[in-house]
C-alpha cells in the first residue's frame, strides 16, 4: 500500500520514484519481514511459555526428541504476521496474484492454528481429525484454484509448462483447477511432514522461495520470459515481493528455531508456508520446477507413502521410521548433521531447478 502513497508523493519529490522499482521493493520486503519476525520472536515465545503452549512429542519417536517436550510451538504465527504485513506494505494491492497467495497463506494458517490448538490444549498429538483437516484444505484450495483459473482462463496463465521442452505448453482448461488443487494441498502437507527437526523445514522453504523470486521476476519481464521460453505473465512480477517476504520471515524465524530450538512453527506455519509455495508455483506455471526445487519435501512425503504402503502390503517397514529424517536419526546421525545435510541438498536442488529453465 505504500506504493500507492509513493505514487502520490512523487509529484512533490521525485525521490519517491524509487518505490516503483521492483528490485528495491523486493529488498525492503525481505528486510521488513525479517525485522518484524526478529522483533516479534521474543515476545511471542514469552507469551507462548506463559500460556504453556508447548510441543507435544510422540512417545514412539526418537528418544532425543523427548527433551523437546514443552518447547513453545505455534511460532508460525510470527512468520504469517511478518509475511502479511510486509506484502501489504510493499506489493501493489491491485495485483490478484498477491491476494491469491495471501488467501492460501492465511486460510491454511487458520487450519493449522486449529490443529495446533487441539494438540497443545487437549495434549493430543493427532490434533485436528485428519478428514476435517483435509476437508478444509480442499475447500480453501479449490476456492483459490477456481479464482486463479478465472483470472487467466484460456491464456498462457493456464498452460502447462514442461521442463526441457520449450514448444510443449498444452492448454489445460478446467484441468488447471485439478492440478492447482493437488499442488497446493500436496505441497502444504509435504512441508508439514518435513517439519520434524529444528530448522529442517524452514530453510528449504527459504531456498525455494528465493528460487521462485527469480522465476517470478523473469516471468513478469516480457524480454526475459521470451529469452527463457516461459510464459510471460503480467501479474507475476509482484510475486517477487511475496517470495522475498517469505525469505525474510523465514530467516527471522530460523533465528529462534535453529538447533536447539526456542520455538517450533507448528502446523500454523508449515501448512501455510507449504500452501503458499504451491500457490506460487501454480501461478508461475512452474509445478514441475517445484518438484525439483522442493525435492526435499517430495522425498520426505514419498518416504511416508512408501513406509505405510510397504507395511500394509508386506507387513515390513522400509525405513526405521518415517518421515525419512527420523530414519537417519535412528541410524545414529546427530540432529544437526541431518538438518544441515538436508539444507545442502535443498540448496543444490534449487540451483538445479533454476538451471533447467535454460535447458530448453
Curated annotation (Swiss-Prot):
<dbReference type="GO" id="GO:0009252">
    <property type="term" value="P:peptidoglycan biosynthetic process"/>
</dbReference>
<feature type="transmembrane region" description="Helical">
    <location>
        <begin position="199"/>
        <end position="219"/>
    </location>
</feature>
<feature type="transmembrane region" description="Helical">
    <location>
        <begin position="168"/>
        <end position="188"/>
    </location>
</feature>
<feature type="transmembrane region" description="Helical">
    <location>
        <begin position="263"/>
        <end position="283"/>
    </location>
</feature>
<dbReference type="GO" id="GO:0008963">
    <property type="term" value="F:phospho-N-acetylmuramoyl-pentapeptide-transferase activity"/>
</dbReference>
<keyword id="KW-0997">Cell inner membrane</keyword>
<keyword id="KW-0133">Cell shape</keyword>
<comment type="pathway">
    <text>Cell wall biogenesis; peptidoglycan biosynthesis.</text>
</comment>
<dbReference type="InterPro" id="IPR003524">
    <property type="entry name" value="PNAcMuramoyl-5peptid_Trfase"/>
</dbReference>
<dbReference type="InterPro" id="IPR000715">
    <property type="entry name" value="Glycosyl_transferase_4"/>
</dbReference>
<protein>
    <recommendedName>
        <fullName>Phospho-N-acetylmuramoyl-pentapeptide-transferase</fullName>
        <ecNumber>2.7.8.13</ecNumber>
    </recommendedName>
</protein>
<dbReference type="GO" id="GO:0005886">
    <property type="term" value="C:plasma membrane"/>
</dbReference>
<keyword id="KW-1133">Transmembrane helix</keyword>
<comment type="similarity">
    <text>Belongs to the glycosyltransferase 4 family. MraY subfamily.</text>
</comment>
<keyword id="KW-0131">Cell cycle</keyword>
<keyword id="KW-0479">Metal-binding</keyword>
<dbReference type="GO" id="GO:0008360">
    <property type="term" value="P:regulation of cell shape"/>
</dbReference>
<feature type="transmembrane region" description="Helical">
    <location>
        <begin position="72"/>
        <end position="92"/>
    </location>
</feature>
<feature type="transmembrane region" description="Helical">
    <location>
        <begin position="132"/>
        <end position="152"/>
    </location>
</feature>
<dbReference type="GO" id="GO:0051992">
    <property type="term" value="F:UDP-N-acetylmuramoyl-L-alanyl-D-glutamyl-meso-2,6-diaminopimelyl-D-alanyl-D-alanine:undecaprenyl-phosphate transferase activity"/>
</dbReference>
<feature type="transmembrane region" description="Helical">
    <location>
        <begin position="236"/>
        <end position="256"/>
    </location>
</feature>
<comment type="function">
    <text>Catalyzes the initial step of the lipid cycle reactions in the biosynthesis of the cell wall peptidoglycan: transfers peptidoglycan precursor phospho-MurNAc-pentapeptide from UDP-MurNAc-pentapeptide onto the lipid carrier undecaprenyl phosphate, yielding undecaprenyl-pyrophosphoryl-MurNAc-pentapeptide, known as lipid I.</text>
</comment>
<feature type="transmembrane region" description="Helical">
    <location>
        <begin position="288"/>
        <end position="308"/>
    </location>
</feature>
<keyword id="KW-0573">Peptidoglycan synthesis</keyword>
<keyword id="KW-0132">Cell division</keyword>
<feature type="transmembrane region" description="Helical">
    <location>
        <begin position="338"/>
        <end position="358"/>
    </location>
</feature>
<dbReference type="Pfam" id="PF10555">
    <property type="entry name" value="MraY_sig1"/>
</dbReference>
<keyword id="KW-0472">Membrane</keyword>
<keyword id="KW-0460">Magnesium</keyword>
<feature type="transmembrane region" description="Helical">
    <location>
        <begin position="27"/>
        <end position="47"/>
    </location>
</feature>
<dbReference type="Pfam" id="PF00953">
    <property type="entry name" value="Glycos_transf_4"/>
</dbReference>
<dbReference type="GO" id="GO:0051301">
    <property type="term" value="P:cell division"/>
</dbReference>
<dbReference type="GO" id="GO:0046872">
    <property type="term" value="F:metal ion binding"/>
</dbReference>
<keyword id="KW-0808">Transferase</keyword>
<keyword id="KW-0961">Cell wall biogenesis/degradation</keyword>
<keyword id="KW-1003">Cell membrane</keyword>
<feature type="transmembrane region" description="Helical">
    <location>
        <begin position="94"/>
        <end position="114"/>
    </location>
</feature>
<dbReference type="GO" id="GO:0071555">
    <property type="term" value="P:cell wall organization"/>
</dbReference>
<dbReference type="InterPro" id="IPR018480">
    <property type="entry name" value="PNAcMuramoyl-5peptid_Trfase_CS"/>
</dbReference>
<keyword id="KW-0812">Transmembrane</keyword>
Amino acid at each position: 500500500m505504500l506504493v500507492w502513497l509513493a505514487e502520490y508523493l512523487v509529484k512533490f519529490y521525485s525521490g519517491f520514484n524509487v518505490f516503483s522499482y521492483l528490485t528495491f521493493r523486493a529488498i525492503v520486503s525481505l528486510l521488513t519481514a525479517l525485522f518484524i519476525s526478529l522483533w516479534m520472536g521474543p515476545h511471542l515465545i514469552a507469551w507462548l511459555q506463559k500460556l504453556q503452549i508447548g510441543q507435544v512429542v510422540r512417545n514412539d519417536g526418537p528418544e532425543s526428541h523427548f527433551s523437546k517436550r514443552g518447547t513453545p510451538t505455534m511460532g508460525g504465527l510470527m512468520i504469517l504476521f511478518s509475511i502479511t504485513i510486509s506484502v501489504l506494505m510493499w506489493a501493489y494491492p491491485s495485483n490478484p496474484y498477491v491476494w491469491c497467495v495471501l488467501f492460501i497463506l492465511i486460510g491454511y494458517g487458520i487450519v493449522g492454528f486449529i490443529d495446533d490448538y487441539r494438540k497443545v490444549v487437549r495434549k493430543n498429538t493427532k490434533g485436528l481429525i485428519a478428514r476435517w483437516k483435509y476437508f478444509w484444505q480442499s475447500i480453501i484450495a479449490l476456492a483459490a484454484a477456481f479464482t486463479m483459473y478465472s483470472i487467466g482462463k484460456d491464456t498462457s496463465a493456464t498452460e502447462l509448462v514442461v521442463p526441457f521442452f520449450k514448444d510443449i505448453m498444452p492448454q489445460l482448461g478446467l484441468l488447471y483447477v485439478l492440478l492447482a488443487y493437488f499442488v497446493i494441498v500436496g505441497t502444504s502437507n509435504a512441508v508439514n511432514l518435513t517439519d520434524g527437526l529444528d530448522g529442517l523445514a524452514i530453510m528449504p522453504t527459504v531456498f525455494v522461495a528465493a528460487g521462485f523470486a527469480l522465476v517470478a521476476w523473469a516471468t513478469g519481464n516480457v524480454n526475459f520470459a521470451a529469452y527463457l521460453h516461459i510464459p510471460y505473465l503480467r501479474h507475476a512480477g509482484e510475486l517477487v515481493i511475496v517470495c522475498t517476504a517469505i525469505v525474510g520471515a523465514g530467516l527471522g524465524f530460523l533465528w529462534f528455531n535453529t538447533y536447539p530450538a526456542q520455538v517450533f512453527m507448528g502446523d500454523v506455519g508449515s501448512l501455510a508456508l507449504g500452501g503458499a509455495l504451491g500457490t506460487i508455483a501454480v501461478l508461475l506455471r512452474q509445478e514441475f520446477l517445484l518438484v525439483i526445487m522442493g525435492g526435499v519435501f517430495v522425498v520426505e512425503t514419498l518416504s511416508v507413502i512408501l513406509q505405510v504402503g510397504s507395511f500394509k502390503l508386506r507387513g515390513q517397514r522400509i525405513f526405521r521410521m518415517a518421515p525419512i529424517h527420523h530414519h537417519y536419526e535412528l541410524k545414529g546421525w546427530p540432529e544437526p548433521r541431518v538438518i544441515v545435510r538436508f539444507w545442502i541438498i535443498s540448496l543444490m536442488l534449487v540451483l538445479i531447478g533454476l538451471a533447467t529453465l535454460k535447458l530448453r
